[in-house]
């Protein structure tokens, strides 16, 4: 498998917990640096907030409500000039289950 010099790998990471997301980014950057690839990032993207409004009372009292929110943290990592060793190392990398990963070549 030959990869030209102009290719790059873009990795998008999403998680509800920012600490797990940052440790996953560190693992990816460490793997890229061990295989002599040039890594740019992690670039933080805006955090998405989803707010849910729920009535506290099961019957009446419409004025009493609770608000719950879910924050979705996102990061982007670009890897320039990846080798086949870099791709193999990224495929074998174990990341936590709370992190959603999207890889584009």
Swiss-Prot record:
One cellular-component annotation, GO: chloroplast
Cross-referenced SUPFAM superfamilies: Ribosomal protein S10 (SSF54999)
Localisation: Plastid, Chloroplast
Gene3D superfamilies: Ribosomal protein S10 domain (3.30.70.600)
Keyword vocabulary terms for this entry: Chloroplast, Plastid, Ribonucleoprotein, Ribosomal protein
Signal peptide: none
Superkingdom to which the source organism belongs: Eukaryota
Gene Ontology BP annotations: translation
Pfam families: Ribosomal_S10
GO molecular function, one term: structural constituent of ribosome
InterPro entries hit by this protein: Ribosomal_uS10 (IPR001848), Ribosomal_uS10_CS (IPR018268), Ribosomal_uS10_dom (IPR027486), Ribosomal_uS10_dom_sf (IPR036838)
Family of this protein: Belongs to the universal ribosomal protein uS10 family.
Function: Involved in the binding of tRNA to the ribosomes.
NCBIfam families with a match to the protein in the record: PRK00596.1, rpsJ_bact
Subunit-level organization: Part of the 30S ribosomal subunit.
Stated name of the protein: Small ribosomal subunit protein uS10c
Gene name, Swiss-Prot/TrEMBL: rps10
């Amino acid at each position: 498998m030959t990869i030209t010099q102009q290719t790059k790998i873009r990795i998008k990471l999403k998680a509800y917990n920012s600490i797990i997301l940052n440790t996953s980014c560190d693992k990816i950057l460490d793997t890229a640096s061990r295989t002599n690839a040039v890594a740019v990032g992690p670039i933080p993207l805006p955090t998405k907030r989803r707010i849910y409004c729920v009535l506290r009372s099961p019957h009446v009292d419409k004025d009493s409500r609770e608000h719950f929110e879910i924050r979705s943290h996102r990061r982007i990592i670009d890897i320039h000039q990846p080798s086949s060793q870099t791709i193999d190392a990224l495929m074998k990398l174990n990341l936590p289950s709370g992190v959603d990963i999207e890889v584009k070549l």
